Structure formats: structure tokens, C-alpha cells
Amino acid sequence: NVDAVLISPNFREETLALAAYLQENKIAYAFVDFNMEEARALTYIGQDSYKSGYIAAKILMRNYSAGEGQELVLFLSNNKDNPAEIQMQRRLDGFMSYIAEEYNNLVIHEVILNKSDQESNQQTLDEFFRAHPKAALGVVFNSRVYQLGEYLRHAGRSMKGLIGYDLLKANVELLKSGDVHYLIGQRPGLQGYCGVKALCDHVVFKKSVEPVKYMPIDILIKENIDFYFEFV
């Protein structure tokens, strides 16, 4: 028998079906990483995706120089319209909210990258950077900023500012090398710990649980990344 379930809801329809089953069987469940509000979990533990996008823009645009005519690039997933990409869309919404407030005349490009076809990505990026030499600032809203960072390194190119999400090994290596300038960490270990604790408090100790517990939005650079992992 199952008393409680901790879920990272990456897939909309599957998550809704699981949530309906758990509700019918009176089994408590909590979400980490992404909140799917209509599934009515006991609690959500993770970042505010919209705010993290807003902050990402604010950090990235510190590198902006209007006098150089710099242009901004949104590197988006080819699955961006998939319901599983809702978290990325919320980050994008927050990011663009800050840009709209502060940089009305900024030239913005969108480049679609394929999750699994690096050869196609290379061709896309080669053509884009040849056509847009002033594209100096970039953002990736998922964990695959390494795709872009590795391309820049191998192509002998660089950007004035590049920000992405998640502390995958490949991302961290590129942060340390300077090919990626910022990573936003989400403390997945702490999310899991808080999720289990909330379920235990509810199921075992009959305590009330907050419906939302937001994690800090951590900005990592090459100078502080080595001090971070002990506390993730």
C-alpha cells in the first residue's frame, strides 16, 4: 500500500491521470520542480518559474551595451508548444516582462534548437550567427544550455552574456570555462527533502502543510559555483 507520492510533473496528461487516481484513493501527493495547479496537489515545492525568468533577464541585461547595438537571442526548444514545456513558457513570460519594462527598442531573435539533433542545431546556429553578428546576449530556458555553450566553444564564438538553468555536469563545466556566464540553480535535493517532509507532516503527524513553498532562485557564476554544491 502507498501512503503518499512525491511527483515531478513533467507530462501534463499523465500527471492529471495519476492525480485523479490518487484523489480517488485518498492518497496524498506533492509536487516538486513544477506546479500544475489544476492537479490540486497537497503542496508544491520549487521555484516561482515566472519570477525566475524575470530575474534571469535582469541579470543577463547587466551585460547590455546600447552603444554597441547588441541584440538578444531567445534559444527555444522545438517542443516549446508541448504541455510538458509549461514551466519553460512561464520562465519566458517572466523574462519578457522585464524586457518589456526596461528595453522597448531591443532587437530580439528566436532560435529553435532540437533536443536530440545536434547536427541540425549546428547548421541552424552557423546560419544564425553569420546573419546576425550583433547577437551578443542569449538565454536558454531549459537545462540544455550546454548545447549552445558547446557549439560556441567548438565554433570559436562567444557571447557577451549567456544564461541557462540547472546544474548539469556539462552546464557547470561550461560555466567554469566562461562559455556560459550564469546558471540558475533550483536545489533539487532540497526540493525533494521538503516534499518528503511535507508529506510526512501531513500523513504521519497530521500537521497542516503550506500549499506552496517557493525555493530560492540561486544565481551561479564561475566564481561561486564551487561553494554551492554542499548546500544543494
Question: Where do the language-model regions lie?
Answer:
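Hydrophobic alpha-helical
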Residues: 3-23, 109-171
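Non-catalytic structural scaffold of enzyme domains
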Residues: 12, 17, 40, 61, ...
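Flexible loop/hinge segments that line or gate small-molecule binding clefts
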Residues: 17-51, 168-176
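Conserved phosphoryl-transfer motifs of two-component systems
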Residues: 43, 181-182
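Hydrophobic alpha-helical segments within soluble ligand-binding/sensing domains
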Residues: 45-71, 171, 186-204
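Hinge/beta->alpha junction and helix N-cap segments in small-molecule ligand-binding domains
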Residues: 46-54, 76-94, 106-123, 140-144, ...
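Hinge/cleft segment of the Venus flytrap/periplasmic-binding protein
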Residues: 83-84, 99, 187-232
